From Swiss-Prot:
Keywords: Cell membrane, Lipoprotein, Membrane, Palmitate, Signal. This is Uncharacterized lipoprotein MPN_467. It comes from Mycoplasma pneumoniae (strain ATCC 29342 / M129 / Subtype 1). A lipid is attached at residue 26 (N-palmitoyl cysteine). One of its GO terms (cellular component) is plasma membrane.
Length: 101
């Protein structure tokens, strides 16, 4: 049972890391993320600078986790929008999928 909990925590953190990295490339979503983090944590993070450092990435992930605890619906929507945009632009490193319709 503990292995399952640990695995889900690791998977959850990996999802936030992936989405946090993807958000750095999406300027429209970047503004939404900045506002969401500011509303839920009170921190005003410069994402373009924070995403370039290991400590900055940790801060973004921690802020996203806190934001998810406070406002799961908006946080999830933002992360899924960022993932979708990055996927459509081919920034996920999965070139074999073509989702354009």
């Amino acid at each position: 049972m503990r292995k399952k909990r640990l695995l889900s925590r690791i998977s959850f953190s990996s999802l936030f890391l992936l989405c946090g990295t993807l958000l750095s490339a999406c300027t429209g979503i970047q503004a939404d993320l900045r506002n969401l983090i500011k509303e839920t944590t009170g921190k005003d993070i410069d994402l373009s600078k924070a995403i370039k450092t290991k400590e900055g990435k940790k801060n973004i992930i921690a802020s996203l986790k806190k934001s998810y605890e406070v406002n799961p619906r908006d946080t999830t929507k933002l992360l899924l929008d960022a993932w979708k945009q990055s996927f459509e632009e081919g920034k996920l490193g999965i070139p074999d999928f073509d989702l354009t319709m």
